[in-house]
Amino acid sequence: MIDVWLPVIRKLKEKNDIKIDFVFPELSSLQHVEKNSDLFSLAEQFSDDVIYRGHSNRWFVAPTLIEALAGFKVSNAGEKMAALSSRLTNGKASKYLILKTIGKYISAISKYFSYIKENFSGQSLYDLSLFKNVNGILCDIIKEHKYTNKELKNELKDVPKFSMLHGLAATWVMDEFICDKFVTKRSDVTVYTMSNLEVSGYKKCFGILDENLVHSGIPRHDSDWIEFICNQSTPVKDDIFDSFVLIIGRPASPYNTPERKKKALRDIYDVVCMKHKLKLVIKRHPKETGDGIDNRIYNEVLGIENYGKSWMYSDMHPFVLGKKSIFSISFFSSVVIDMLAINKPTIEYLNLEGLDLYDSSDSLRDESGNPVFQFRYVNLVLGVSAKLELEQYVESILNQYEMTISPLCSMYKKYFMPFDGASKMVANDIYKRVESHKISQQKDTFVNLNSESKK
């Protein structure tokens, strides 16, 4: 979410006296923040206050992201209690009433200890009613319905909202944009569409008015923003291989099980590292960090003894890594669209065949009838499900680069119609609408006062 709005925030901050606070309503959004990443450094530059929900479910405010992370940090014992509670109340064990009840008790105990810890930590409590004083909110309206946003939704109901999709996507083939009937119209939301193909979905499924739909392309693909990001990387972080293939990480999941992820990685290692003598740099997904199953998979398949020799991790921004890479490989990620903005192709290795939830009559399918996800369906990636296909596309990229990437770039331009200066355009539009709303509020106040004086 932050990554999408940062280029616009940068332009807004160039205007006088604009204060922008970052709000984290979900615990997981701060839990998975990687403070050594380029994205964290960028966000720290442009945030004023940081408002976040603590483990006790209370709201706090800190002047910087670093201080918010320090206040949010929980002990190892607390993490284990929270994880156990989650497994018992939401996992497979929850079908047993006694275990689910135990999980709820553990959750209550965990929150109590968090409450005590927060009281002694020196964190500053935040009064949610202060949100009524803000002039606008930058958000993704698609996520407005989430339970964690319920309090914010109530406090911000009269505040103008400006929305961009939190991750790049082919929304026009997503379930959220395919609804049976029109919803109630609403005038409090302005949406900056990345593709004109999103318009009908926003109108029908989210009630957005025509005059509040503004085509913006993809602001984070502005050339000055990409240049700004690349210039931010420190010399220490530049210590990566001179030539490499970028792996865009994704945690193991029901659609990419640990076994399937292992197989894909083995095939990638065999083709890229063994056959073509190339190296791998892995940009991990925020949920892959730590000592979980995903790191164990990388260490097991790629060989921990080979770390720094044939493969390594990097926290650098995807644009920086993408520019340095030969090409990228993903397991399913919106970053593939970012790669096309810098003229780099991505091979998506994902096999959904035989998975009941993803290989059904409702599944998207490619020309060969294979079940696929959105990016493969709309031809923004080179899709593979097996080693032979991977070998063919790697050969094609290495030997016929322009011919291989050209169709992908054509689809990118067709769908999104990107243009330079999008972030400035969006910032100016937001500023204009906020000022207009402030003037209308002043007029309403004047009218109300006059009507009262006549009574």
Feature names for model-found ranges:
Residues 220, 287-342:
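Donor nucleotide-activated moiety binding/catalytic core segment of transferases
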Residues 126, 316-317, 389:
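Short acidic active-site motifs
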Residues 135-136, 190, 244, 279, ...:
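Structural motif
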Residues 417-455:
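C-terminal alpha-helical cap of glycosyltransferases
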Residues 220-300:
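Conserved catalytic-core segment of nucleotide-activated headgroup transferases in glycan assembly
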Residues 210, 306, 334-418:
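Catalytic binding pocket for nucleotide-activated donors in carbohydrate/polymer assembly enzymes
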Residues 14-22, 275-280, 308-311:
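A generic structural motif
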Residues 1-225, 288, 336:
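Active-site and donor-binding regions of nucleotide-sugar-utilizing enzymes
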